[in-house]
């Protein structure tokens, strides 16, 4: 069993890294935002491209929803509604709706396949980083010089202050060199378990 969490700003290479782990190394991807994306896709009648597409597709205002972008919809529903307020009706949940959902899913997966390798591609909050470490996971921060975010949403701001990662991958060379760094991280993560 190997559990890897990926963190980094928009456009840093998290999706590229996760895709490599899935396609080349047989990892299973589970993001904290999976249930949120499914719910928002249905609620706001969003397309796959608006949810899972390019940065441009996620940032394009949707006139049906008064010019709100799919990214803003996900941020607001995920953080401002679910993460910050669900504890009001589920005391004890605190801000852990997405980690709690993952814990239930992961427990079921480990019972079925204790040797599964899992990548979480969207670590954005300290409680998520702490949760991955609690499960014995390996946390990779991906930094891509020249890609700066001016997004002031709490999910982007808190991400910048997390220091509990195991390693920083600097994504500033060729894709092959980036993949080589990922392989080294998997080797390190495998040795931890």
Curated annotation (Swiss-Prot):
Which terms are listed as keywords in the entry? Answer: ATP-binding, Kinase, Nucleotide-binding, Transferase
SUPFAM superfamilies from the UniProt entry: P-loop containing nucleoside triphosphate hydrolases
The parts of the chain that form a coiled coil are none
- Write out the catalysed reaction: a 2'-deoxyribonucleoside 5'-phosphate + ATP = a 2'-deoxyribonucleoside 5'-diphosphate + ADP
The EC code for this enzyme is 2.7.4.13
For whether the record's keyword set contains Kinase, the answer is yes
Q: Which organism is it from?
A: Acanthamoeba polyphaga mimivirus
Query: Binding positions for dGMP?
Result: 10, 36-37, 58, 122, 124, 128, 155
> What is the name attached to this protein's record?
Putative deoxynucleotide monophosphate kinase
Q: Does the keyword ATP-binding apply?
A: yes
Q: Mention one GO molecular function.
A: deoxynucleoside-phosphate kinase activity, ATP as phosphate donor
> Matching Pfam families, A to Z?
DNMK
Which EC class is the enzyme in? transferase
Q: Which residues take part in binding ATP?
A: 13, 16
Database matches in InterPro entries: DNMK, P-loop_NTPase
Q: According to its UniProt record, which protein family does this protein belong to?
A: Belongs to the dNMP kinase family.
């Amino acid at each position: 069993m190997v559990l890897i969490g990926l963190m980094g700003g928009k456009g840093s290479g998290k999706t590229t890294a996760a895709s490599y782990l899935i396609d080349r190394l047989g990892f299973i991807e589970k993001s904290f935002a999976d249930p949120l994306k499914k719910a928002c896709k249905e609620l706001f009648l969003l397309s796959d491209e608006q949810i899972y597409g390019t940065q441009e597709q996620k940032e394009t205002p949707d006139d049906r929803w008064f010019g709100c972008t799919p990214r803003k919809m996900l941020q607001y529903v995920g953080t401002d509604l679910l993460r910050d307020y669900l504890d009001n009706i589920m005391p004890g949940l605190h801000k852990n709706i997405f980690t709690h959902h993952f814990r239930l899913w992961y427990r079921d997966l480990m019972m079925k396949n204790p040797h599964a390798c899992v990548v979480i591609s969207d670590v954005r909050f300290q409680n998520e980083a702490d949760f991955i470490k609690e499960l014995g996971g390996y946390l990779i921060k991906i930094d891509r010089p020249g890609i700066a975010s001016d997004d002031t949403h709490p999910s982007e701001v808190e991400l910048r202050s997390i220091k509990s990662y195991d390693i920083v991958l600097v994504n500033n060379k060729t894709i092959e060199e980036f993949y080589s760094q990922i392989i080294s991280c998997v080797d390190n993560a495998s040795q931890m378990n």
